[in-house]
Amino acid sequence: MAGCRDPRVVDTLHLLLLVAVLPLAVSGVRRGAVDWTQEKNYHQPALLNVSSLRQVAEGTSISEMWQNDLRPLLIERYPGSPGSFAARQHIMQRIQRLQADWVLEVDTFLSQTPYGYRSFSNIISTLNPTAKRHLVLACHYDSKYFPHWDDRVFVGATDSAVPCAMMLELARALDKQLFSLKNISDSRPDLSLQLIFFDGEEAFHLWSPQDSLYGSRHLASKMASTPHPPGARDTNQLHGMDLLVLLDLIGAPFPTFPNFFPNTARWFGRLEAIEHGLRELGLLKDHSSERWYFRNYGYGGVIQDDHIPFLRRGVPVLHLISSPFPEVWHTMDDNEENLDRTTIDNLNKILQVFVLEYLHL
């Protein structure tokens, strides 16, 4: 995550007006014959019972995630660097080994930067690309470029190696359930899961509309011009995005995630409810009722991040970014030593339950 606070936290009136006119889902509304692009507005989660919640908590492993997913990403990985290539290969290899048979696409392009043209590569991993609708989880895998200082490099642990590792751990822990999405049935919506790892979120110099969000700007434009389902004349891949859940700045202790957008408030409410439910069952560790992670206390400033190019095109967004930012943000101390395992483990459980509920698994 890049830029200083002023350019990233912007006046939100125009964005809130945009999301306010997007269709709001109303519980209990009868769908009838609803166009498939509108089904997301009436989609309801399939809540997990206590036994299933316990299975999720038992099935995720912070130790395995830490060793196999996170540590290989704790390297310098700004766009075009050797570390960027290594991180990209690591992410793809971790996904390719899974049973669920993800379809991987690498979206590589050149873009002008303050330092000339640079190559960027987004990673898009999709379960059942033929499904009309997808729940999308996303993060950025690049790290901000800083000159080496006293032989130290910036590895961006919270920004955003941990979100990448959380998504990889979700794919591993839920592999068996996600494998079943290949078998479309009348009892389940035509809905699947997509993981996006953006390149070039960070600014090379100073945050600006031109020097930031390279990968997400490119991919949003590309998806808007790609027919979906294949051969469609009036719908594109953005129509197929039910909800974009963007993870950023995660891994520091005691995070707070506010709700930014009214049109996705009911899905933020599910995160709140899942957190409360898991705590009541004793499935969250060292979790205080005075420090809830998810707090719906109104709609504050919109933070510039990879969701913006999609939000402007009408995609519903949940922005899971800790606010205020971690104290280590954009410092050399954003490293493994300052991560909080318990917090990450708890958030893994909440996110995995959310995905299972959304996908009716």
Curated annotation (Swiss-Prot):
Source taxon at top rank = Eukaryota
Intracellular or extracellular location(s): Secreted
Enumerate the glycosylated residues: N49, N183
Q: Where do the annotations place Zn(2+) binding?
A: D159, E202, H330
- Please classify the protein's predominant subcellular localization into one broad category: secreted
* Organ and tissue specificity: Expressed mainly in brain tissue.
Q: Which GO terms describe its molecular function?
A: glutaminyl-peptide cyclotransferase activity; zinc ion binding
The UniProt entry annotates the active site at E201 (proton acceptor), D248 (proton acceptor)
Which keywords does this chain's UniProt record carry?
Acyltransferase, Disulfide bond, Glycoprotein, Metal-binding, Secreted, Signal, Transferase, Zinc
Biological process terms from the Gene Ontology for this record are: peptidyl-pyroglutamic acid biosynthetic process, using glutaminyl-peptide cyclotransferase
Q: What is its EC number?
A: 2.3.2.5
S-S bonds: C139-C164
Give me the Gene Ontology terms describing cellular component. extracellular region
Signal peptide (residue range): 1-28
Q: Which InterPro entries match?
A: M28_QC, Peptidase_M28, QC/QCL
What catalytic activity is recorded? N-terminal L-glutaminyl-[peptide] = N-terminal 5-oxo-L-prolyl-[peptide] + NH4(+)
Q: Does the keyword Ligase apply?
A: no
| Matching PANTHER family | GLUTAMINYL-PEPTIDE CYCLOTRANSFERASE
What this protein is reported to do is described as: Responsible for the biosynthesis of pyroglutamyl peptides. Has a bias against acidic and tryptophan residues adjacent to the N-terminal glutaminyl residue and a lack of importance of chain length after the second residue. Also catalyzes N-terminal pyroglutamate formation.
Q: Which family does it belong to?
A: Belongs to the glutaminyl-peptide cyclotransferase family.
Q: What is the name listed in the Swiss-Prot or TrEMBL entry for this protein?
A: Glutaminyl-peptide cyclotransferase
Task: Name the species this protein comes from.
Answer: Bos taurus
Gene, per the UniProt record:
QPCT
